């Protein structure tokens, strides 16, 4: 079972039908099946390697390490990142399909660590290269902290999915044609507040009053007749 409490609308409804899209279904299933790409360079990555053992058993969280960035949706950076390694890290991140997430593990990845004071080739924070979703400080952080960071990322993904659904419902737009046969995209009109500008139609010649026509006729200056 998924340990993340996904905010369902009604848990007590029986014999109900849930309608969704294929994209939302894949996002929901991603909560328990994150495929990480391991980018480790130093001692912090050794702490993450201990999660593979039977004591922590990170397989129960659905984590399946991938060797190709095209098959991963999460990249775990651990250790010092140098200037020469920066282009390869950016390329790996760009090759990952959307949506993609980043967890920065350890002080060296987050701020440069002890190498940031007197090193000319150390990147002072991996967030200067790629966007980071979860920061995990420590030198090195414990395996329990890594599991907690992954749990926080899963909660963040669940909130993003739910907020996206609410936002799409609030910004529900309807497509319709006006009386002038013009196509418009507007918000939902279930509230009864209609935009009268959509229903404006220029009057035809049969609807022009005689007084309006006479005023226009007076303004027109005809050339003098001989």
From Swiss-Prot:
Membrane-topology descriptor: Peripheral membrane protein
Entry's cofactor comment: Binds 1 [4Fe-4S] cluster.
GO molecular function, one term: quinone binding
Predominant location: plastid
Keyword Plastid: yes
Catalytic activity, reaction form: a plastoquinone + NADH + (n+1) H(+)(in) = a plastoquinol + NAD(+) + n H(+)(out); a plastoquinone + NADPH + (n+1) H(+)(in) = a plastoquinol + NADP(+) + n H(+)(out)
GO BP term, pick one: aerobic respiration
Cellular compartments annotated: Plastid, Chloroplast thylakoid membrane
Annotated Pfam families: Oxidored_q6 (PF01058)
Enzyme Commission number, as recorded: 7.1.1.-
UniProt entry keywords in alphabetical sequence: 4Fe-4S, Chloroplast, Iron, Iron-sulfur, Membrane, Metal-binding, NAD, NADP, Plastid, Plastoquinone, Quinone, Thylakoid, Translocase, Transport
Enzyme class: translocase
Quaternary data: NDH is composed of at least 16 different subunits, 5 of which are encoded in the nucleus.
Functional note: NDH shuttles electrons from NAD(P)H:plastoquinone, via FMN and iron-sulfur (Fe-S) centers, to quinones in the photosynthetic chain and possibly in a chloroplast respiratory chain. The immediate electron acceptor for the enzyme in this species is believed to be plastoquinone. Couples the redox reaction to proton translocation, and thus conserves the redox energy in a proton gradient.
Family per similarity comment: Belongs to the complex I 20 kDa subunit family.
The protein's name: NAD(P)H-quinone oxidoreductase subunit K, chloroplastic
Name of the gene: ndhK
